[in-house]
Curated annotation (Swiss-Prot):
PANTHER family: HISTIDINE BIOSYNTHESIS BIFUNCTIONAL PROTEIN (PTHR42945), HISTIDINE BIOSYNTHESIS BIFUNCTIONAL PROTEIN HIS7 (PTHR42945:SF1). Its cofactor is Mg(2+); Zn(2+). GO terms for cellular component: cytoplasm. Binds 1 Mg(2+) ion per subunit. It catalyses: 1-(5-phospho-beta-D-ribosyl)-5'-AMP + H2O = 1-(5-phospho-beta-D-ribosyl)-5-[(5-phospho-beta-D-ribosylamino)methylideneamino]imidazole-4-carboxamide. This is Phosphoribosyl-AMP cyclohydrolase. Its EC number is 3.5.4.19. It is an enzyme of class 3 (hydrolase).
Length: 141
C-alpha cells in the first residue's frame, strides 16, 4: 500500500490540483534537486524512493535512495552535515522534486568535501572539451 495517493488520469488535476501525488519512475524513484535555502546554490541531485520521501516529510531531514549502494541514505548521518528541509516543491507533472535545505555541521554536501557536487565546469574551446575545477576540497572524505 502506498503512502501517497495514486495519480488520477486527469492531467489537469496533476498539474493544477492541490493534491501531492509524486510520480515515481519504473524503478520506483523520483529525481530530487537540492539547493541551499540561504543562497540558492545547487548542492546535489539525488533520487528518492517512496520510503525516502515519506521519511523526509515525516522528519524534516532529507533522506534519499542510494542507487550505487541499493539502500536508504539519510544524507549527513555519518558526517553530521544533515540536510534540514526548509521547503519542498514538485514540478508540473510531479515527477521531480526540489528540496531547499539548510546543511548542518561544517557544511559540505559532496562526499569529496566540497559544498556542492557541481564543482566542475565543462569547458569547450577550440574543439577541445575539458573540466575546470572550481574551489578546493576543504575536507577529508
Amino acid at each position: 500500500m502506498s503512502f501517497f495517493p495514486a495519480q488520477p488520469s486527469d492531467k489537469k488535476a496533476i498539474e493544477e490540483g492541490a493534491a501531492f501525488m509524486p510520480r515515481f519512475d519504473a524503478s520506483g524513484l523520483i529525481t530530487a534537486v537540492v539547493t541551499d535555502a540561504r543562497d540558492g546554490e545547487l548542492l546535489m541531485v539525488a533520487h528518492m524512493n517512496e520510503e525516502a520521501l515519506r521519511l523526509t516529510l515525516e522528519t524534516g531531514i532529507a533522506h534519499y535512495w542510494s542507487r550505487s549502494r541499493g539502500k536508504l541514505w539519510k544524507k549527513g548521518e555519518t558526517s553530521g552535515n544533515l540536510q534540514s528541509v526548509v521547503e519542498l516543491r514538485t514540478d508540473c507533472d510531479q515527477d521531480a522534486l526540489w528540496l531547499k535545505v539548510r546543511v548542518a555541521g561544517d557544511g559540505p554536501t559532496c562526499h569529496t568535501g566540497r559544498r556542492s557536487c557541481f564543482y566542475r565546469q565543462v569547458v569547450a574551446e577550440n574543439g577541445d572539451i575539458s573540466l575546470a575545477i572550481e574551489g578546493a576540497c576543504d575536507h577529508e572524505h
